[in-house]
Amino acid sequence: MTHKFAFNTIVPWNDFLSQYSKVKNALHGKKLRIILDDDPGFYYVGRCYVSNFTNEKNIGTISVECECEPYKCKLAKTVVTKAVAGTEVITLTNSRKRAVPEITITADTSLNIVYQTYNVWDLGSGSYTLPDLELLEGANEVTVTGTGTISFAWQEGAL
């Protein structure tokens, strides 16, 4: 996905090339997080290229193109925390992009975690990333048995 931007500046022409050079050094070829004014809750990740500049009627315009990943990501990770005493079914609702959550457990004993029936783990206190616990778009149910606190954190992405 390509995003194109045009930035206008009103500086004297003898300062414009210096300004253009500063912008080019700051952006050109760099992979950056890009937050659009029209979509402030998300960011895009892309490599930016400062393509050219024009000067019309003492208004300088600098053109920037960014080749971005197809998904826009929420600014903050989604976090679901649950205190478990017995058996709890926890629903993790995810956007379009598949994600593997970071799991943090605080428990005196282990917690039994079941995802999609055939993925079962017994985990004690600590932080984990389980590749088989991949969240799909929509509601994802995880069954947790034991006593303790479990937290799921992941980066959501949408088109």
Question: What is the meaning of each model-derived region?
Answer:
Residues G29-K72:
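Short beta-strand and beta-hairpin "edge-sheet" elements
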Residues V11-N14, P40-V45, S110-V114, T149-F152:
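Short, surface-exposed beta-strand/loop "edge" segments at domain boundaries and coil↔beta transitions
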Residues I10-F42:
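Short N-terminal edge-element motif at the start of the domain
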Residues Y71-L159:
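Intrinsically disordered, low-complexity segments enriched in serine, threonine, and glycine
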Residues K22-A26, F53-N55, A83-T87, D122:
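Short, low-complexity, polar/charged sequence segments that are solvent-exposed and flexible
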